[in-house]
């Protein structure tokens, strides 16, 4: 089995469907004997350019090890799902398990936000 990195963007009005979509896609990979090495839900983000007059989309990143049949099935599913605006599937040489730069940047900002909130609470007292 080969390793793949999959990113897909979902219509912002369909964001509530994302957990179900992730569950379906990961389920099909696992049923075929594949593995999910990394799964990140980046949430709703600004697009670099408008797609179908939309300026935001819900991003999901998956790193999987799966047979080619499952990848073909995912491609077909993405193509015929109107909620998926764009997708990319890239074959990688190795399994990628460390956090992506998007998640690392978010984690670096969180402690600062917590400190700021504590300072704000102290100022109120």
From Swiss-Prot:
A Gene Ontology BP annotation from the UniProt entry: translation
Pfam families: Ribosomal_S6
Keywords from the named record: Ribonucleoprotein, Ribosomal protein, RNA-binding, rRNA-binding
Composition skew (Acidic residues), residue ranges: 116-125
Keyword check for Transmembrane: no
Recorded GO CC terms: cytosolic small ribosomal subunit
UniProt entry tagged with the keyword tRNA processing: no
Coiled-coil residue windows: none
Signal peptide: none
GO molecular function (one): small ribosomal subunit rRNA binding
PROSITE patterns cross-referenced by the UniProt entry: RIBOSOMAL_S6
Region (Disordered): 99-125
Compositional bias per record (Basic and acidic residues), positions renumbered to this chain: 104-113
Family: Belongs to the bacterial ribosomal protein bS6 family.
Biological role: Binds together with bS18 to 16S ribosomal RNA.
NCBIfam families in alphabetical order: S6
Protein name per the record: Small ribosomal subunit protein bS6
Species, as recorded: Histophilus somni (strain 2336) (Haemophilus somnus)
């Amino acid at each position: 089995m080969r390793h793949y990195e999959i990113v897909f963007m979902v219509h912002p009005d369909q964001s509530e469907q994302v957990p179900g979509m992730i569950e379906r896609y990961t389920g099909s990979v696992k049923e075929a004997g594949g593995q999910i090495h990394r799964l990140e839900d980046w949430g709703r983000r600004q697009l670099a350019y408008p797609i179908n007059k939309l300026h935001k989309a819900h991003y999901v990143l998956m790193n999987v090890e799966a047979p080619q049949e499952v990848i073909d099935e995912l491609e077909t599913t993405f193509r015929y799902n109107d909620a998926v605006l764009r997708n990319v599937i890239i074959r990688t040489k190795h399994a990628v398990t460390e956090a992506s730069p998007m998640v690392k940047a978010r984690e670096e900002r969180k402690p600062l936000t917590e400190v700021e909130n504590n300072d704000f609470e102290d100022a109120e007292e």
